[in-house]
Amino acid sequence: MKRYRHTGWFGLVAIAVLMVSTSAMSNAQSAQHPQWVGTWAASPMLALDGRAMRPFAAVTLREIAHVSNGGEQVRVRFTNEFGLDGLTIGDAHVALSGGGSAIKDGTDHALTFGGASSVRIPPGAAIYSDPVALAVPALSDVAVSFYLPSQVMRGETYHAFADQVNFVADGDVSGAATLPSPTELKSWYFMDGIDVNAAEGARAIVTLGDSITDGALATENANSRWPDVLAARLKQEHGLENISVLNEGIGGNRVLNDQAGPSALARLDRDVLAQDGVRYFIVLESINDIGRLARLTGPEDEVTAPMLEQGLKQIADAAHEHGIKAFGATLTPYGGAGYSSEKGEQMRKDVNNWIRTSGTFDGVVDFDQITRDPQNPDRFNPLYDSGDHLHPSDAGYKAMGDGIDLKLFK
């Protein structure tokens, strides 16, 4: 049993002085080491085919990221996760985008890495730039430019579907106001995150999913994916304006098996648990696992509803172990899609029923109810169908983002 003795007035004064000193030290440390929160993210994957892989030699890439939270300092995360050789970045800059390949006057800042202007990222690794003072408005476009000198490059790390035009130009033109004679790119290469210094109460939502989260068939450069719609709504909601949304969708992704990028289970640590400031996440995955039932290529494709439910439960349980609230999103209709089947449709309904009723999640986002045709619930509402009967249109993405109950984040 602990024993206590009277401290007297001198002891109380000493304790008070210690508390003030500790508080001052804590405030000083906080000022020196700001809290970071992710404001933009893209899930990296391996570029395998000749269309995706590029002969990046002595060129500058300028990649555009639509951020959610704003801040007064920014840092950029570069990745060589799938490279078999070290990746050298010879020069890097960050600025506010001026549209196209242009940057806004007076916003260009050189990035450094431990004080150096260049860095070599080992195979399988990622690295943050040093923080730089740049006032980044919420919901703005940031341009990150980096020079790749000639080097051996086996295995390129990228995010295939950017739904955003990026640029590449010859030579080291990272600080150019506008890139000279650029070529357009439709992917993000070697960059998978941007953080800002956090305002009080800042935190992040991660959206983990497939092409429906990635924004397939949404209007290019319009930032009309459902996570974008959610991010814009949060900025208008008192008390939630400092919540960012990190889109970790990969087109073609699956829960249980690698297909396009690592499976949701395999990338959970990287894309959800390790994100700076994450407090919530929404998972919308399984439709590609289900779709494979119509196109079996091996025994691993023969999934069942209980298998998918167990995979989703593992994802939710891992989030809970890290103090993150997990929200399950029901699977949107896919009747009439190229890989739809009667067996798959029944499985979709079974998984959706489990998401709604199992109690696994801290809340449910019922995208199925939001997007389905009231007259034919196995199919998308025609108002929300992109035309392929699998992916939403811009109007469908907006309905999804608008249909999320913001009370989940209060």
Regions found by a protein language model. Give the residues of each.
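Oxyanion-hole/transition-state-stabilizing segment in secreted/luminal serine hydrolases
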Residues: 218, 250-306
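Catalytic His-Asp segment of secreted/periplasmic serine-dependent ester chemistry enzymes
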Residues: 265, 291-293, 331-410
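Glycine- and acidic-residue-enriched helix-capping/strand-helix junction motifs
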Residues: 215-228
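Structural recognition of the beta-strand scaffold that forms the well-ordered cores
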Residues: 204-209, 213, 243-249, 279-285, ...
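N-terminal secretory targeting modules
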Residues: 2-3, 24-208, 218-221, 239, ...
